[in-house]
């Protein structure tokens, strides 16, 4: 009989603990849950972060979850090995933004050239700037968007090069999270 009471007491305690976590608004999984959380996330360009906060403030229930997931994915991209899935010439090659401002890429792979042949990076106003040198005197500014979620999460890097002699369409690279 005492074992049954003990089991019920443990079950009740566990239920109360889960309920208190849920009511406190904490996320067991981490990440952004509201616009204040988004504004605190690192590794997102300030202009893009402000857009996400603005979108969050005017969004409804499920839209808020999508915006929070996008912001969290962008923040977590730094330090994560990305595996190219498009264009075909760089499929399965890896690229990473190191948290200390360096790019991690095999310079013998084509992806090195296709990602501006850079060794450093920084956050721009609305972009991730890939830099030739640490002082970023010469750099290319890439916007990064997120498509899908979970195992289907894709980071879409886009570079628009201005000039009459440049392609009309932007350069696009797609990445999945490495295993």
Where are these regions (language model features)?
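An anionic, turn-rich surface loop/hairpin at beta-sheet edges
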Residues: 126-148
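Bacterial N-terminal signal peptides that target proteins for export
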Residues: 2-16
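N-terminal glycine/threonine-rich, aromatic-flanked beta-hairpin/loop signature
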Residues: 86-129, 135, 155-157
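Tryptophan-anchored aromatic micro-motifs
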Residues: 50, 54-92, 119, 123, ...
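Bacterial signal peptide processing site
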Residues: 27-30
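C-terminal motif of bacterial Sec signal peptides marking the signal peptidase cleavage site
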Residues: 23-25
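Edge beta-strand at a domain terminus
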Residues: 114-122, 159-179
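Immediate post-signal-peptide N-terminus of mature secreted/exported proteins
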Residues: 34-56
């Amino acid at each position: 009989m005492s074992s049954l009471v003990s089991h019920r007491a443990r079950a009740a305690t566990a239920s109360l603990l889960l309920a208190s976590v849920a009511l406190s608004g904490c996320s067991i999984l981490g990440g952004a849950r509201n616009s204040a959380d988004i504004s605190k996330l690192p590794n997102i360009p300030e202009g893009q972060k402000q857009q996400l906060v603005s979108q969050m403030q005017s969004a409804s229930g499920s839209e808020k979850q999508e915006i929070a997931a996008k912001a969290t994915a962008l923040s977590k991209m730094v330090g994560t090995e990305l595996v190219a899935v498009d264009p075909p010439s760089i499929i399965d090659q890896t690229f990473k933004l190191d948290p200390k401002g360096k790019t991690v890429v095999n310079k013998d792979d084509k992806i090195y050239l296709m990602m501006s042949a850079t060794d450093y990076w920084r956050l721009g106003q609305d972009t991730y700037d890939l830099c030739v040198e640490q002082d970023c005197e010469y750099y290319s500014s890439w916007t990064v968007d997120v498509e899908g979620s979970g195992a289907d999460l894709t980071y879409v890097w886009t570079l628009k090069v201005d000039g009459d002699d440049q392609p009309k369409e932007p350069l696009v690279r797609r990445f999945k999270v490495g295993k």
